[in-house]
Amino acid sequence: MLIDEIKKANVEAMKARDNTAKGIYSIIMNKYMLLSIEKKQKGEEATDVDLITIISKTLKELTEEKESYLKVNNLEKANAITHQEELISKYLN
């Protein structure tokens, strides 16, 4: 499953001490786990399609956040968000 790939990428980010990558992977995993719990209560199971939806929404949130940082000329934060976008967008292909 796709979540397993993200978990593996999170472990690699931890080993590399890449806090930016670790942060975004953790966010994705937490959102997926919350959705998984909700679905289990309904007798359903979370799928890769659900995870792709989560990633898409997170990318949109990151884009909006990056635009805010660019408006106030905080390039360091904007660049970190660009890195996060690159990391998770590859899971949409």
Task: Identify what each model region corresponds to.
Residues 1-93:
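N-terminal cationic and glycine-rich segments that engage phosphates or anionic surfaces
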